[in-house]
């Protein structure tokens, strides 16, 4: 069993009146771990179903603006998300929690680490900074064109991404996944949870997903060298979707970060290796 339905769901109202949707798994008095989920998967897709309670983790997933239950914020930035999470952690009594950033949620989690929101961070199958000059010759031709277009004309690229649907995104993800990942994604319980998460993420349309994607594909205004909390970077060695070098350069750019390359799995490593990911994170957080 890779995932279960959330134990608790709700929304908080921010100071400007917007809502942020959230979901929680695990004991309410457990060690808080914020979760920044992947592309358009919303608060409904968690991880660590069989280990969260045993580890005493209170996993808290948050919908980014425009996704799921969170109010849209057109033109939002990474800094806006950090400000939202600063309010959210205070309102939910989370203190300075550890955090997990998965896939396209990774740069948002890194921004939170730079902004002092988190006490420790795990990046898992993180969407890398594909606009970084070091990757100019390493990207597949089609991805290179897409990145160049996004950098050159982000508004036009955002309109293109806003044409995506839950079905189109799911087809794209499955078509680029190795068999070891498909074994996870096609498991009945996971497939149902994944579909629900995607449907909720696109409930307000695709604008939230489009904004996320433009931010992730553009040069990041995040000073990775200023991150001072413990960071672990996890990739499956068969992952060909998230980083040109499975996070080697990303790890090197973050002071003191540790790189973990997991054999025989790809982008589904968050669900197949939830226990070592969370156990390591709790150690870094001092829990």
Task: Give a label for each model feature.
Residues 1-24:
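N-terminal cap/lid segment of alpha/beta-hydrolase-fold proteins
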Residues 141-222:
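Alpha/beta-hydrolase
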Residues 79-98:
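Conserved acidic catalytic loop of the alpha/beta-hydrolase fold
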Residues 227, 233-235:
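Short beta-strand/loop motif that positions the catalytic acidic residue
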Residues 18-71:
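Conserved HGGG/HGGXW glycine-rich cap/lid loop of the alpha/beta-hydrolase fold
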Residues 256-287:
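Catalytic active-site module of serine/aspartate enzymes centered on a nucleophile-bearing elbow/loop
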Residues 240-246:
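Conserved alpha/beta-hydrolase "acid-adjacent" motif
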Residues 96-136:
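Conserved hydrolase catalytic core segment
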